[in-house]
Structures are given as structure tokens and as C-alpha cells.
Amino acid sequence: MNTKIIVSAFLLAGLLSACEKDTPAVSAAPQETATVEEPAATPLEAETPSRFDIYAEVGLTTDLSHLSDNQRKMIGLLIDAGKITDDIFWQQVWGDKDELLDGIEDTKMRRFAMYNYGPWDRLAADQPFIESYGPRPPGARFYPEDMSKQEFETWQQDGKNEQYSIVKRDSDGGLVLVPYSKAFSSQINAIAELLIEASALADDEEFAAYLKLRAEALKTDNYQASDMAWMDMKNNPIELVIGPIETYQDALFGYRAAFETFVLIKDQAWSERLARFAKYMPELQKGLPVDDAYKAEMPGSDADLNAYDLAYCAGDCNSGSKTIAINLPNDEEVQLAKGTRRLQIKNSMLAKFNQILTPIASELIAEDQRQHITFDAFFGNTMFHEVAHGLGIKTTLDGAGTVRQAMKEHASALEEGKADILGLYMVQKLRENGEITEGELMDNYVTFLAGIFRSIRFGASSAHGRANMIRFNYFSDAGAFTRDPDNGTYRVNVAEFEQAIKDLGNDLLVLQGNGDYDAVAAFVAEKGNVSAQLQADLNRLDAISIPVDIVYQQGKEQLGL
């Protein structure tokens, strides 16, 4: 590689950084089914260096004063483990980090490459921002770059669709599976040692047991026992998510999981506000707006909802758009047995609300409806999005396998869209039952609409971005909102908005349950695009320098450790 990389061209600052893992920062490469109606194949242009400034910096701090000395030491070890997962993630999506960064002389460009974990802009449909690079490989580094879909699909190999291996070529040019535990053996052994060391400092026995099981899972590529233990762990004030978790980065098939780490501190007061909602999961599942066949699976009712402050993140969740809520584990068997844990990341959420969502609403939401933009509604919509991941259908009706496997690269976008819509359905039902009394339902609707504009800016390379493109177009066709041509602001039409929630919820659940890949691809192709009018409105946000997302100043020093 050249020792000096020059800045390539940047498209106009108004280029759609388009339509979030917000739930997990994601980067599936653009498919033919998710398009932006703008010229989109040229590298980004240097005339607008402000493209390098689309992220607002946020310091990750939280109160650790209530933790013991051992717990504070343990956090330091967990951060050390997280740094290693960051190194693995670089290898999964790019390769040699130092070779790339050392060759970039421009300071802002180098920083932008660090934010994106490579030379592709994750919030602009993965366009290259360095002129010597072409398109991002859809399969990242999970597969040989010269491997076609057909070659993989005709390959007779057990376990080829599993999450915890990479595909390489052997000396004869054939395909071979390499488990993560072997592909990244030195890093994984180092992480496991740190987790074992941290377990000795844990005040909570269940957390100590989880750390040991997670260390073993990393070394064996078998995560189910540790996922079960994680769900059984209820009382520890420190939370850790570590390992290969989400499959967004595999845009070729959506099979392979990328490494990441979250270190979080529980907000006990806010968590107590949320605890009562988990028990309603079975009742809400029964009431879903879809035929009974698509809601026959019953989620666990011992799932828990908690609020946290993020202390550190690394790897997948630190790339591109930042996660503000987590719903795990992803293992369908664990979900049915134990439910899921929903982690609301309060400090990240508040930063996005103040720095991004509120300014967007001031520009694009009708003035007389802006009073309905509230943090409680933003928090609630996000929380119930995560809860809604546990609702619906996990296995196709024909029994052929999981929805995730049937939908392939469209699985993430469809699942994120389902969670958004069913989350709003849950808000409706819980308000009707008197379980949610803060604010009013209109707050959730208007804040939800503003949130669509926020998430569309994550781009076609984001599962959340594509999900929001689909929803915007579906809602527009249904008359759920109206755009005022005189001032370019949008207004929620309540009756049509509520009907669109029911209709889209039904459509997404049916698509998932039927497991019809071609039907899903056609649906995403029809709805997953940005019109010229929407693009022009998004350009207005760029013109007044509203950040697209946030980046973290983080680490032990930031936390005072």
C-alpha cells in the first residue's frame, strides 16, 4: 500500500448518510434492494471536509462511587478485554488496522477511518472516502473476497451457515471453515484470561460464574450455556456483553457474528421504573395484529428491562452509528426458554436526543406538534423496540429453520422494522391498560416520526437505516403523515398513523413467518429507497450541521480509573 493516502472526493455534504444495531451500530453493504435515488458510486469529495465532522463527540462518564474497590478494578480488566475484541473486529471487517491508519496523513481522515473501521463511510451507504479503495466487500473478511454466493451455496459443508467461523481457501483453492477460536486463538485466549481474572474480583457470585462460562464459550465457540447464565444473572450492578454477537456486518448472507464489547453500569432508579413491563410479554404476544399461526410461539415472561450508563464499548457496537439499546441473547432457544434482556443505554440515548433528535424536530416537524417531542417518549419508544424483538415469530411456519436463516441478508432490516412497529403497538396497548401514564400517546407518535428521520440518515448500509426507509415509504403511502409544501415540515395524522402501525406489523410478521426470501427481497426493493423529496429534506439537516451520530471519548482515564 502507498505510504501516503490522499483524500478522495466527498459528495455534497447533503449526501444521504442515510438511513442504526441504533441498535447496534451496523454496516451491511448496500444491496440492490436498498437504494438511494441519487448518483451513488463515486468516492466522497474533499470539497466538503465537514463530512469528516458528522459525528458529535461525547465523553463517556458515569458515577462509579457506589462500587467497591474490587468492582472498579474489575471494570478496568473488562475494558482491557474489550480492547482485544476491538482488534478482532478490525480483522473481521478490514484487516491490518495499522497499515491503513499509518498511511493516512490527513488527521481528520485518519480519525474518520477509525470511526468507520476502514475506508468506507458507514453512514453513506459504505461509499469509499479514500480514492484508492473500491466498494466494500459484502462479506467483509468473513469469506474469501473472490467467493461467489453460488460457490458458497453449492458447497457441501456441515455448519457452513453457523455464526462463529470464517470461510477461507485451502492450499488447493477450495473452501474451508475455520472456527473463531482457531482463527483468532491468541486474542481469544487473552480475553478468556482477563475474564477469569475479573471473575475473582466479582462481588456477585452469578456474575463471577457468567464470566467463567463466557471465557469457556470463547474458547469453544459454544455460547449457549453462557447465554443462559447471563439471563439468570439479575443483581450485579455491572453488566458485560462480550464476544461475537450481531450478524449485521455479514451483508453477503447475514450468518456470521462480529466481535464487540459493552461495559455498562446499572441505573437502579430507572431500572425499577421499567421492571414491571416484562410480565406482559405473553399477553402482548397473544394480541399481536396478525393471524394466530404467526404468534403461536410464546416468549419467556422472566425477561428483564433495565437502564444503564455505558462505560465503554468496542468493536461492532463502536463502529458507525452508536447503539442506544440492546436486546439479547440472539439465540432463539435461549429466548424461548428465558426470554431476553433489554438494556436501555440512558447516557447515550440522552446525548442523541439533545444533540440530534431535538434539532431535527425543530427543522422537520410541524411547529404545533413539536411540543410532543419528549425524552420520555424517545426512551419509551426505544425501550419497547427492544422488548418487541422478543415478540413475533422465530421459526418459519414450514418448520424449515429460523427466520434469520430464511431471510439471509434481509433478516436484520426486517427484524429491526418489526421491532420498531411492534414496539409502538406495545406502547398503545400499555397506555390503554393504564400501565404507562407519563405523557400522552401523541408524544410517542410524533417522537417516533422524528426518529425516522434520525435513523434514515444511517444509510442503506445500516439495518436500522433500511428499516426506517421502508417504514417512511409505507407510512407515506398510508397517509400516516402529511408534508406541508410551504414550509417543508411533517405532521402526524393520528387515525392513519395508527392503522399503518397495524398493517405494517401484520405484513412484517407474515413475511417473516412465511420465510419467503423472494417476497422479502421484492418488498425491500419496493420500499427501501429514498425519494428525491425526502433526500432534499435530509439535505437541510446537513446544511445546518446537525450531527448524524455520536462518537465516544472513552476509557479508564475518562472514568477516573
Q: Model regions: which residues?
A:
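Active-site recognition of the HExxH zinc-binding catalytic motif
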Residues: 68, 377-394, 419, 424
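Post-HEXXH active-site segment of zinc metalloproteases
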Residues: 393-417
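Long, well-structured alpha-helical subdomains associated
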Residues: 424-522, 526
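Contiguous, non-catalytic segments that form substrate-binding/exosite surfaces or channel walls
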Residues: 180-370, 374
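C-terminal motif of bacterial Sec signal peptides marking the signal peptidase cleavage site
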Residues: 15-18
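N-terminal helix-rich structural modules
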Residues: 37-210
